[in-house]
Amino acid sequence: MFGGSFFSSDDDGFSMMSQLRSAFHNNVNQRFDTRYRCYPVAMIPGEERPNVNYGGKVILPPSALEKLSRLNVSYPMLFDFENEAAEKKTHGGVLEFIAEEGRVYLPYWMMTTLSLEPGDLVRVINTDIAQGSYVKLQPQSVNFLDITDHRAVLENALRNFSTLTKSDIFEILYNDQVYQIKVIDVQPDDSRHVVSVVETDLVVDFDPPIGYEESLQKNKQQNIAGVQGTMVTKIGYDELVRQGDSNLMKGTGTKLNGKEVAEVPKINLLDVEKQECPAPLILPLGTYFFGYPYKAPSIEEDSKKDPNLFKFEGAGTSLRASRKTNGTMGKGSSDDPIDIDA
């Protein structure tokens, strides 16, 4: 009953459990660490995909998905991207697994950050990154201020990103214009200075865009120049007119008989004064100004007028001699109608 076969079977069971435990332990400790030849997403066969180029996710080959599945890497899959030759590093996610074997396609801004050229080697390592709660960004151009709703534009753009790394300058596309934005600060912060922006509530703050102070100074100078006056003031037109008027008709006159012309007082034809803007006309509500004082006619003056005063007075004229009737015809009136013979 308790022969050697029983103990042999028990030993096999312990051996199998030990192997499973060892395999699980190895998978937990292992990580995805592979090197690929990198290329910009613009070189992906097929139609252009702006959401890939202006985002923070890469495209890996199908073999990467198989290996990540064996390692039980949890979602979201986040990675370190490292250029070992230049000792530069950034972070991001993965969008699809459709690249050719041995290749990885990166957004152009990510290749610029890592100082990579097409065909260079890049190291890809899976990692865990804490979810972010706060980021501070700085647009790299004052053109970003032309966007009316920054929050909506940025919220839509960050859907194409998985992480944000401090000091990175990423790119977004809006209304066919590319905007560069630098990550100034992230919270929570660690030694890697990176946060995850996947399924998290993120507070976003902005620093003034680069060139904003110069733009304000330029606008201020333009406003000061406008207050000082127009081109007439700038060229000193008033002084030029006075000088020209004083230099007119210089010399002495001579009569035909040789006598000198008596000096006459000079007449200043132009008296140019500095033109200033008229003071604003401030009137009470409901009051109108017609440019001159208005005097309403009095009622007494209208009553003094003679109501029987004839405005038109004269005598009628007939085209032929009319029949004489008894009585005297009144002035300006006729008892007989005007007859016209056919």
Curated annotation (Swiss-Prot):
Region of interest called Disordered, as start-end residue ranges on this chain: 303-342
GO biological process: ERAD pathway; ribosome-associated ubiquitin-dependent protein catabolic process; SREBP signaling pathway
Gene3D superfamilies xrefs: 3.10.330.10, Ubiquitin fusion degradation protein UFD1, N-terminal domain
Cellular component aspect of the GO annotation: cytosol; Hrd1p ubiquitin ligase complex; nucleus; RQC complex; VCP-NPL4-UFD1 AAA ATPase complex
InterPro entries attached to this UniProt entry: Ufd1-like, Ufd1-like_Nn, UFD1_N1, UFD1_N2
The organism's place on the tree of life at top rank: Eukaryota
GO MF terms held by the record: polyubiquitin modification-dependent protein binding; SUMO binding
Protein family: Belongs to the UFD1 family.
Physiological role: Functions at a post-ubiquitation step in the ubiquitin fusion degradation (UFD) pathway. It is required for vegetative growth.
Name of the protein: Ubiquitin fusion degradation protein 1
